[in-house]
Amino acid sequence: MKKVIVISTSLRAGSNSDMLAEKFAEGAKASGNEVEKISLRGKEIKFCVGCLSCQKTGACVFNDDVPEIMEKVLNADVVCWATPIYYYEMSGQMKTLIDRMNAMYPKDYRFRDIYLLTTAAEAEEDTPRRAEIGLTGWIDCYGKSSLKGHLFCGGVTDARDIEGNACLMQAYEMGKGV
């Protein structure tokens, strides 16, 4: 059994990326894994100010929801990120959280397998490329981990447009395969 954390970064209710995250989580649970889905919707996540206090003390100077999320990520075997693509890039919330996770850098971590779920109005295959590159930059800082899978579902604009889309089953199967 693996400990799986699924981080849904969209702030929109009924978002397509959140629905993919839910299916991934369901698949991972169906395989007997311990799964927790974290939605950034309603979370307080302040911007990193680059003070690097976290590198000296191991903790960020801000008191918000990030330390709790970070602790869960550090202790997970699998981390799945779900993000809508905005202007061909990951959501601002996802990037802000990644920046704030700088405090994790000197710490030991369990995660090895990273997954990325992306959705966008644009349907071209290379639409999420920059988001994947951005996440890979974070992954590269954790030498024992790697990107194990990326699922992109394009052509979904409005909330819940993804309902009935084959991508939902693909997310479920990807989760089941962790």
Task: List each model region and its residues.
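Short, glycine-/small-residue-rich phosphate/pyrophosphate-handling segment
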Residues: 92-93, 105-149
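Residues that line or immediately flank small-molecule/substrate-binding pockets and catalytic motifs
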Residues: 83, 154-155
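Hydrophobic residues at beta-strand termini and immediately following loops
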Residues: 38, 117, 151-153
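A short acidic, helix-capping loop that chelates divalent metal ions and anchors anionic groups
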Residues: 119, 155-161
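N-terminal beta1-alpha1-beta2 submodule of the flavodoxin-like/Rossmannoid cofactor-binding fold
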Residues: 1-83, 88-104, 148, 160-178
